[in-house]
């Protein structure tokens, strides 16, 4: 949201030494970085609660997190196959971080980190690098053969197309998430300014749906990209 609590502004100023809350308010980057730290703290706290006194018969937070992770593991297995299960921790971390980041923006006084292009670009570039590192590790130098095309005389045509397609992946991942989350924030802000009591409620409910959909899309595309790098290079 665009009107943080006074306490949150004070905390931001304390975290970024040498800056006042007013100065930080002029730079949305610092606000999103601070909320990113908050999301990480929430995930660490949930993880500690889930693993504290963990038992064979799960209960409470352990039961909830096991249900969430089992669902994510099923999606990873269905999309990437058994060979892709080694990347389950990466995909699960992405999914949990994105979901909490998207949902936190629905709380008045908080801004979703995913409404910043910097956050989304960092995640998208990370997926891009992992994809090609996996490809090289699995297939060696043969991984780059699929950039050249099936026959050598098609290389001048296929190579630029493949390069543009791969370079567009982090761009599309980051811009899609940024556009949806930032756009929803703007719409919600407008509704709050017009009718601050009841009218924003449907938009907030839609925001929950958008948060889950955007998390799923980012996670699914990441799995598809990495699974493509795992396949036999042709």
From Swiss-Prot:
SUPFAM superfamilies xrefs: F1F0 ATP synthase subunit A
Transmembrane segments: 29-49, 90-110, 116-136, 147-167, 186-206, 207-227
Superkingdom in the source lineage: Bacteria
GO cellular component terms listed in the entry, alphabetical order: plasma membrane; proton-transporting ATP synthase complex
Membrane topology: Multi-pass membrane protein
Localization terms from the record: Cell inner membrane
Any one biological process term the GO annotation gives: proton motive force-driven plasma membrane ATP synthesis
Keywords of this entry: ATP synthesis, Cell inner membrane, Cell membrane, CF(0), Hydrogen ion transport, Ion transport, Membrane, Transmembrane, Transmembrane helix, Transport
Gene3D superfamilies: ATP synthase, F0 complex, subunit A
Annotated GO MF terms: proton-transporting ATP synthase activity, rotational mechanism
Stored InterPro entries: ATP_syn_F0_a_bact/chloroplast, ATP_synth_F0_asu, ATP_synth_F0_asu_AS, F0_ATP_A_sf
Function: Key component of the proton channel; it plays a direct role in the translocation of protons across the membrane.
Assembly, per entry: F-type ATPases have 2 components, CF(1) - the catalytic core - and CF(0) - the membrane proton channel. CF(1) has five subunits: alpha(3), beta(3), gamma(1), delta(1), epsilon(1). CF(0) has three main subunits: a(1), b(2) and c(9-12). The alpha and beta chains form an alternating ring which encloses part of the gamma chain. CF(1) is attached to CF(0) by a central stalk formed by the gamma and epsilon chains, while a peripheral stalk is formed by the delta and b chains.
Family: Belongs to the ATPase A chain family.
Entry protein name: ATP synthase subunit a 2
Organism: Syntrophotalea carbinolica (strain DSM 2380 / NBRC 103641 / GraBd1) (Pelobacter carbinolicus)
């Amino acid at each position: 949201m665009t009107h943080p609590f006074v306490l949150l502004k004070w905390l931001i100023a304390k975290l970024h030494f040498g800056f006042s809350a007013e100065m930080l308010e002029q730079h949305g980057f610092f606000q999103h970085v601070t909320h990113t730290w908050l999301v990480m703290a929430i995930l660490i706290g949930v993880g500690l609660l889930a693993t504290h006194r963990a038992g064979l018969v799960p209960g409470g937070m352990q039961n909830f997190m096991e249900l969430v992770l089992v669902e994510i593991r099923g999606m990873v297995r269905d999309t990437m196959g058994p060979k892709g299960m080694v990347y389950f921790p990466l995909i699960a971390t992405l999914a949990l971080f994105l979901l909490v980041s998207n949902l936190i923006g629905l709380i008045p006084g908080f801004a979703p980190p995913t409404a910043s292009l910097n956050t989304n670009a960092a995640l998208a570039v990370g997926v891009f690098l992992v994809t090609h590192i996996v490809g090289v590790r699995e297939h060696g130098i043969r991984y780059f053969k699929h950039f050249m095309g099936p026959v050598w005389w098609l290389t001048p045509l296929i190579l630029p197309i493949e390069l543009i397609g791969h370079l567009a992946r982090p761009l599309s991942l980051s811009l899609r998430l940024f556009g949806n989350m930032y756009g929803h924030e703007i719409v919600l802000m407008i509704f709050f300014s017009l009718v601050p009591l009841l009218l924003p409620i449907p938009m907030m409910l839609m925001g929950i749906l958008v948060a889950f959909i955007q998390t799923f899309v980012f996670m699914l595309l990441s799995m598809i990209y990495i699974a493509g790098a795992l396949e036999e290079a042709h």
